[in-house]
Amino acid sequence: MNKTNIGIFLCLFFVTASYFYIFSNNEKVGSAELEEGQPIEIVLVPAQISEQGLLGKNIFEHKCQSCHGINAAGRYEIGPPLVHKIYEPSHHSDQSFYRAVALGVKAHHWPFGNMAAVEGLTQGDIKAIISYVRELQRENGIL
């Protein structure tokens, strides 16, 4: 092995070791003071919400809030925030919300486990929920 290869190997080793050291702890930075169920994000609520958004808020509060938190802020150790860059339309389109409700979701971004399908919602209900979530996202600079 020449000096260049040894240098590359050592750099890769230290980067990999640092990654595992930093991310091996399951707790997020700043989460030590959170207790189970507390909001994960601070969510600003728009001064005015559309009629469709208000309908969605009402449905969200009955069907989604127990996991996703008040105003979709998430609940520590329970469910993810939907007012988060991960859920912007370029990464999670409106269609992904329809699919999540109908089929459930295998955990892939967060450590909360899988989401079960949600029963008893019409396509119109889901559309209203999406409207509410997108309005919250817009107010929080995500859209």
Over which residues does each language-model region extend?
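The canonical Cys-X-X-Cys-His
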Residues: 56, 61-70, 129-133
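Stable alpha-helical elements in mature extracytoplasmic
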Residues: 52, 93, 97, 125-126
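Hydrophobic single-pass membrane-insertion segments
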Residues: 20-31
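Hydrophobic membrane-insertion alpha-helices, especially the h-region
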Residues: 7-21
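Positively charged n-region of N-terminal signal peptides that target proteins for export
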Residues: 1-4
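Electrostatic cytochrome c docking/interface patches
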Residues: 29-59
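Axial heme c-ligation environment in periplasmic c-type cytochrome domains
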Residues: 76-83, 103-136, 141-143
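Gly/Gly-Pro-rich "capping" loops immediately C-terminal to redox-active cysteine motifs
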Residues: 57, 69-100, 117-120
